[in-house]
Amino acid sequence: MMKVALLSSLIALSSIAYADEFKLISTDIAAGKPLSIKQVFNGFGCTGDNVSPQLAWHGAPKGTQSFAITAYDPDAPSGSGWWHWTVVNIPADVSSLATGASSSPAGLPVGAIQGRNDYGNSGFGGACPPAGDKPHHYQFTVWALKVDHLSVDANASGALIGYMLRANALAKVQIVAPTRR
């Protein structure tokens, strides 16, 4: 009888822990699946739609005061990866961004700021791995932060924002989409 009670308690606790797990989902991208033409850059020899993906998250840790989003290619032949998108100062009560949110200020929550991607623009810059290269592992990450505001502007580089995110992160969750051309 004691074993049954213990087992029941463990099952109940595991489902509570599962319910509180920080998760990221998307209708546009999937873990382990290549990005679609919608998330491919239009330039640098690529001919995609350059549309930021829909992202939704839940289960952020207690104490989360804001969120940030990054899209990063650690496999880019730059010596330091490639920042495709950074969004900071997303209020803690926001839990999703729609497809194409980066395309206009109205697509982002009030107060959110998009930093400069490595194409030199503020906003989303889609995937564009070199032709014939190995798959690049595009990391779409939502960061739960212990601060409500990062003091950056739209000219902030991905490297600066990445540094500030790591210094202020409570947790992060990501979808990795290996993509080649």
Predicted segments, located by residue:
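Bacterial N-terminal signal peptides that target proteins for export
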Residues: 1-6
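Hydrophobic h-region of N-terminal signal peptides that target proteins for export
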Residues: 10-18
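N-terminus-centered regions that define maturation/targeting leaders and the start
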Residues: 18-181
